[in-house]
Amino acid sequence: IIDLENEHFDYGMAGEGEFSFLKMVEAILNNDHNEIMKVPGLVKRLSKGEYHINPNHRVHDLNLLPRPARHLVDMEAYFKIGAFHSAKSRSKRVLSVMCSRGCPEKCTFCSTPSMWGQNTRWRSTEHIMDEISNDVRDFRIGEIQFDDDTITVNKKNLYSLCDKLEKVGLPWCTPNGTKVNYHFKKQDEMYK
């Protein structure tokens, strides 16, 4: 959460805000204070030292989320500076993709369960590949980086994704790493 003591702060959003933020903006534009205060994940500074914080909202069906609007961003600027996670990237033209949210683990060093919850939710392979194929075409991508913390949790989805990625023919990696006990015998074959 941003600095709640900052006097320039009126509203904020905690958790997954894709849909809640839109509700908040609509309520503000309609000057509807009652609706503003009902928005899931709303953080509002009431007065010095007092805050209103609503429970956040989880997006259960990640396929409802639109593809990232990368066409509205200066992607060439990102590519120029090499804004990516892995020190071993093979290209500066990196596409960062999230396939899932959540993690069933409770690692003391990690904020993923707090941010995304402990139930892992996956986008469909088709939804993921739609994003990848469009952005590979539009931005001449040279490498794909999956930023999921638990991309190897769901074997069925991972196998399906790997089958589709093979046809794309680009190198890919998981710069956030994977949990060692999620690895399984066939996984080495998939990473080749």
Question: Can you name each region flagged by the protein language model?
Answer:
Residues 63-64, 69-192:
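Radical SAM [4Fe-4S] cluster-binding motif and immediate context
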Residues 1-58:
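Glycine-rich beta-alpha loop elements in corrinoid/cobalamin-binding modules
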